[in-house]
Structures are given as C-alpha cells and as structure tokens.
Design a protein with these regions (language model features):
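Small-residue-rich hydrophobic transmembrane alpha-helices
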Residues: 57-117, 161-180, 281, 292-358, ...
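Short alpha-helical transmembrane segments in multi-pass integral membrane proteins
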Residues: 1-28, 85-157, 207-263, 320-385, ...
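Hydrophobic/aromatic residues within transmembrane alpha-helices of membrane transport systems
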Residues: 33, 45-49, 60, 85-90, ...
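Short runs within selected transmembrane alpha-helices of multi-pass transporters and secretion channels
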Residues: 78, 153-172, 180-188, 213-229, ...
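Small-residue hotspots at the loop-to-helix junctions and early N-terminal turns
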Residues: 54-65, 147, 151, 214, ...
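Transmembrane helical elements of multi-pass membrane transporters/channels
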Residues: 26-45, 153, 187, 220-224, ...
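Helix-terminus/linker motif at the lipid-water interface of multi-pass membrane proteins
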Residues: 36, 40-58, 127-141, 199-208, ...
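Generic alpha-helical transmembrane segments of integral inner-membrane proteins
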Residues: 32, 36, 40, 44, ...
Length: 469
C-alpha cells in the first residue's frame, strides 16, 4: 500500500499527461530541427575535410576552436545592446534602435580588428599550443601548415560574420526572426556545395583541400551578409531603424555607459566560457596529435546528439519563464519538475543509441586507427554522461528563467575555469594517465554542479516574477 502511494506521488510529480508533452514538444521540436540542420551540415562539412587526411582535419579543427572564441565574443558584445534594442522597439523609438545598432557596430569592429591583429601576429603560436603532444615532426609541421593556410583565409570571413551578427540580432529584437533564419539556411547550402566542389576539385574547380573548405566558409558568409543587409535596407517600411542608419555613427555617451554596465558581464561570460573550452582542448592535446583529431570527430558527432537536451533546456526557459511572468508559481514548479524529468528521460534514450553507434561514426573519416579508436571511446564517455548534462542544462535554464543570472554565471564560466580547467591542466601535465581518463574526470566533476543545481531548484530560489518586481 505504501509503495503504491510512493509510485503515485512520483508519477504525479515527475510525469505529465499527453497534453503536457504535446505542449513541450511544440516548443522543443522546432528548436531541435533548426539546430539539427545546422549541426548535421557541420557534420557533413567536417566529414568532407576529414576524408582528405588527419593533418588537414586537425589543422582546421584547431583554427575553428580559436575562431569559436571570437564568435562568442561578438555574440556577447551585441547581446548587451540587444536588451536596449528590444525595449526601444517596444516603445516605437526607432532612433533608439539606430543608436543601439551603432553601438553594436563599434563594439564588433573593435573586437574584430583586435582579433585579426592577434591572429596575424601570434596565430601560428596559438596553433602550435595544440601541437605539443605526440606525433612525428612531419605530422606536426603538416598540421601547423594546414592550420595556417586555413586561418589566413578564414580571417577574410570575420567582417561579414560581424555584420551578420549586428544586423540579424537587431532584426530579431525588432520581431523579424524568419529572414535571418532563411539567410542562414542559404549560407549553409552555399557552404556545403562549395566545400564539395573546392575540397575535392569536382568538375572544373581546382582541388584545394583545406583551403577550399576555408574559401567555401568565407564565401557563404558574404552571401549571408549580402542577403541580410540587402533585405534590411530594401524593406525600410518594415525596418524603420534602417532609414538614416548611417547618417552618423555617433552613440550618446550616456547610452554607451548604460549598455556597457549591462552588456559587459554578458561579453565577459561568453568570452570566458569559449576560452575555457579552447583551454580544455589544449590540455587534452598534450596527449598527442591523434587526440586533436579524435576530439574533432567526437565533438562534431556529440553536437548532433546534443540538440535534444539543448532544445529541451531552451524550452524550460520559455515555458517556465512564461508561467513565472504570469505569477503562477505552483504551476511553474510543477511544470519544471516534469520538464527536467522528461529531458533526462529523453536524453537517456538518446545516449543509449549514441553509445551503441559510437564505433560506426569514426569510420566515416580518413584517419588512422588510433584516432578512430580514441574518438569511439570519447563518444561513448559523452553518451554515458549525457543524462547528467541534460539535468544540468535544464536546471541552468530553470535558474535563469527566474532571473538568477549571477548564479548561472557561476555555473557557466566560473565553474569551468575554477574546477574543470585545473583538473584537465594538472592531470594532462603532471600525471601519465590516459587522455580518456582525464576526459572522464572533467565530465565527472560536473556532478558538483548537479548537486548545487538540485538544491537550488528544490529550494525554489528561482520562483520569482522579475517583470513585476
């Protein structure tokens, strides 16, 4: 009798009805599809480079890891101004929107110029940081050569990427979400097509290998920028902020100060997190060049499967956030419990599929047996920890939906720099343990976050309406 009551209580707390799951999936599935398309194309892109050799693949993956830090810097840089853009648009203050756009422009220009100068002066040294492990002198020299070739071309794609982020973020904050998505899909198709033509030299196109992959990426970014910028200025009736946008590039000092106060923590958080991910990869790379190749393979595969817990986590922020805004705290807590349980359950099923299929994915790449074997086990380890990551992601967005941004900052950037990176740094440099054990230890450390997240969610520190207060 007692056991029946416990089962009934568990079911009521963590399992919803059909209507509940339909509501959750209605929010989560479109996010999964959008992220799924992007990550699947990235997988195909990665496989194309991976088919031409280990050194080419490793060189490109190292550069992409470094450019990823720049990408998130830009994202963080424009996000702070975006808070003001949305409010100005809500007030129909188009001049205010123009001013926030100009702030984004200057912030992005400063970050982009700084990044280009850094890569031109110390780019080779940054790539070399990932080549300190095992491998023959020839393999290391080839990886550095291909990485430098890839980087030199990819730098040409930073300005259009910058402009796309400025325009697309402003359009979204003004309610236009479809055009940036369409432009992104076109860019993906252009990238995929020219990757195939230029990497392998199909038809009358030259066989350029890793340089072809970089050219295809840069070309796709200019196409995306042309679509977004062109559409914005051709449809000024929809985009009133575009009228007289470049009549001046001055930004009022008081607005600049306000945006810096709100936006600097966001920029800081994104930069810290991205640089920590780059540092983790560098720590693993101490164990040899094959580790760089295997991480590239496993991370690309992981990204395809991770769309499930990422989409469900985003859904928590949307659905629970709306309930908090409506002041229905009881329903918000009940919904959150069920959504966290649903996310963990879904990701446990996905993890099983991922674990079973792990030996097959590395076979798609033209690399050596050691790199394939490492990639297989890295994918298996990630699959094992996927339910943990699903729980973490859901609790992270639960706390953020209640406005606990300081806690989420501690969760995100501070934890990875104070716990994960030191573990990887010490174990990779001062012990002889296998890289797979180091990787697993870093994943295992996230259990600390799980415990903290569980306590905070259970205590209900996130149950607040930040709009009315």
């Amino acid at each position: 009798m007692e056991r029946t009551k416990e089962r009934s209580s568990f079911r009521k707390k963590f399992i919803g009805d059909r209507k509940f799951y339909m509501m959750v999936l209605a929010v989560a599935v479109p996010i999964m599809i959008q992220n799924g398309i992007t990550n699947f194309v990235s997988l195909l892109d990665n496989i194309m480079i991976g088919r031409i050799g280990t050194e080419q693949m490793s060189g490109a993956s190292i550069v992409n890891q470094l450019i990823f830090v720049y990408n998130l810097c830009i994202f963080g840089g424009v996000s702070g101004a975006g808070i003001f853009t949305a409010q100005y648009f809500g007030q129909k203050d188009h001049e205010g929107v123009r001013q926030t756009f100009r702030y984004k422009f200057w912030m992005a220009v400063i970050l982009t110029i700084g990044t280009i100068l850094m890569f031109l002066t110390v780019g080779e040294n940054l790539i070399s940081m990932y080549l300190q492990g095992g491998g023959t002198a020839q393999q290391i020299a080839d990886t550095l050569k291909y990485g430098k070739q890839y980087l030199d071309i990819m730098l040409l794609g930073l300005p259009p990427f910058m402009m796309v982020q400025i325009y697309s973020s402003t359009l979204r904050e003004c309610g236009e979400t479809v055009l940036p998505m369409k432009a992104g899909v076109v860019a993906i198709c252009v990238n995929l097509l020219f990757n195939y033509l230029l990497i392998y030299g199909v038809f009358f196109f030259p066989r350029l290998g890793v340089r072809g992959a970089a050219i295809a990426t840069v070309l796709s970014r200019y196409v995306e920028a042309a679509i977004v910028i062109g559409w914005t200025h051709r449809h000024t009736e929809k985009n009133a902020f575009a009228k007289g946008l470049y009549s001046t590039l001055k930004v009022p000092a008081n607005l600049t100060k306000k945006i810096l106060v709100k936006g600097t923590p966001l920029l800081f958080n994104e930069t810290l997190w991205a640089s920590a991910m780059a540092m983790l990869t560098q720590c693993y790379s101490i164990r040899g060049l094959n580790v760089v190749a295997s991480l590239n393979i496993s991370n690309t595969i992981n990204n395809v499967f991770n769309i499930v817990f990422i989409a469900l986590g985003d859904s928590v922020a949307i659905i629970v956030g709306q309930l908090l805004g409506a002041g229905d705290m009881k329903k918000a807590r009940d919904t959150d419990n069920k959504m966290i349980a649903f996310s963990v359950m879904c990701c446990t099923c996905v993890a099983m599929v991922m674990f079973v299929m792990a030996p097959l994915f590395p076979m798609l790449y033209n690399t050596n047996d050691e790199a394939r074997e490492l990639a297989k086990y890295l994918i298996m380890i990630t699959a094992f920890f996927m339910p943990q990551n699903a729980f973490l992601h859901a609790t992270y967005f639960t706390l953020r939906s209640g406005g606990k941004t300081i806690i989420t900052f501690l969760f995100d950037s501070v934890f990875i720099w104070c716990v994960s990176v030191p573990i990887a740094f010490v174990l990779s440099r001062y012990t002889g343990i296998h890289v797979l054990v180091i990787y697993a230890c870093v994943q295992l450390a996230d259990l600390i976050k799980c415990v903290i997240g569980f306590v905070l969610v259970k205590k209900g520190v996130w149950l607040q309406n930040i709009v009315s207060s």
